[in-house]
């Protein structure tokens, strides 16, 4: 957060979650979005001029030097702890909002029409056949070991089957990790 204040000024503190603002950073046109993939205070900076990528990178690294920032990827552990979905990992285009716990965002009683409204009404009436839920996984801490056949940077499927006491598959785990904060395996 301090790096963003140093780059853009104190207005960044007033940017609400999932809001964005078009602005410039030393004549580099950008869109700043208050988002994040880990549940922490996060921002995304989108270039509006792709030719200025190196300039933007250098500005960010320079502003981050006092804070010892370094390039990295998002934290899978923090994402799972925060309950933030990863598209294709936790949900797909074939899922509906009722299955993934987003039904609070769907108003089927509104006067306005939208694509899929009738299909969603039917699903609500008939009920869902599956539900995305959070669970605790007993046992030794889960490690995030990527099999050697996967190239770094590519999607690694890690869906684990979940069986009932009769060993019948009743679902699958989409994302999992050992949470150091909670001191247990979560999914």
Residue ranges and their predicted role:
Residues 1-187:
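Conserved, structured C-terminal
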């Amino acid at each position: 957060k301090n790096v963003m204040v140093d780059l853009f000024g104190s207005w960044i503190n007033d940017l609400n979650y999932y809001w964005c603002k078009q602005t410039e950073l030393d004549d580099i046109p950008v869109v700043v979005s208050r988002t994040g993939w880990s549940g922490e205070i996060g921002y995304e900076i989108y270039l509006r001029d792709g030719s200025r990528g190196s300039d933007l990178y250098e500005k960010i690294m320079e502003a981050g030097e006092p804070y010892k920032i370094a390039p990295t990827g998002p934290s899978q552990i923090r994402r799972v702890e925060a309950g933030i979905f990863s598209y294709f990992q936790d949900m797909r285009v074939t899922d509906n909002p009722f299955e993934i716990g987003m039904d609070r965002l769907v108003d089927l009683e509104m006067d306005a029409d939208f694509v899929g409204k009738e299909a969603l009404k039917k699903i609500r009436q008939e009920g869902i056949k599956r539900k995305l839920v959070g669970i605790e996984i007993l046992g030794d801490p889960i490690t995030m070991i990527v099999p050697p056949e996967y190239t770094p940077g590519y999607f690694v499927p890690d869906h684990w089957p979940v069986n009932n006491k009769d060993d019948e598959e009743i679902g699958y785990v989409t994302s999992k990790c050992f949470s150091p904060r909670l001191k247990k395996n979560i999914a």
